[in-house]
Amino acid sequence: MSRFRGWIQAGATLLTNLHLPNFLKGGLYQGAGKTVCVPGLNCYSCPAASGACPIGAFQAVVGSSKFSFSYYITGFLILLGVLLGRFICGFLCPFGWFQELLHKIPTKKLSTKKLKPLTYLKYAVLLVMVFLLPAFLVNDVGMGDPFFCKYLCPQGVLEGAIPLSLANSGIRAALGKLFTWKFSILLSVIVLSVLFYRPFCKWLCPLGAFYALFNRVSLFQMKVDKNKCVSCGKCARACKMDVDVTKTPNHTECIRCGMCIRACPTNAVSFRYGFGNGKETTKKTTMEESK
């Protein structure tokens, strides 16, 4: 499956953005699909978007004048987390794929191994910008801003503000300092993505942070067969998310990309679906080996 990951990412991005003619019209799809969240980071304001961004939808609920915990969106995210974990990041997220395409540009690449403390930032973004600020920093009528979407998310500029402003002169005339700020963030992510592998995913994405909480318990896991592993270290060197799959098969940073599977010379690493620890493997008995 990992060999076809690029095609799966392209297909997922297309399914998430089915209404392509809207790019020329300068309008948004407002059908029933917008009441359903998509699994990856994809802006609601993208003209082609066929569903709602779960992070944006969650903020809209907690920031409303009548605060109520979003059981539907939270339940949806928990379900996806339990079923797939960060497989969504590696296979189904449009913005993750965008960063990977940028990283393919032939330039010198930089390692993020010494920058591991930055991976904890995304949990702060999830807690503070997605939940606490929209819920408790409100205006006179009791409404909070969607702080992550409004002030940090680069996907909103890439998919929403830029295409809409190009097609709509009214929107173009209304662009101001906030757009300049968000555009600078997008530009920074683009430059960093050329040099580093998935910098936004590693350091700032709150959706990835949420799915990471379920990586160790999700049904979709990485499995390491200790009987086949020769401790060559090729899997760890191949991992661009800085994970040693032989030590922590279902690390919170693992996006199930499958690079370790392709690098393993003995086929000791594999995907598995179901309950159980990825490190556990049933050793063959002498009788079984003799068969």
Feature names for model-found ranges:
Residues 1-246, 252-291:
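Non-ligating segments of multi-cofactor redox enzymes
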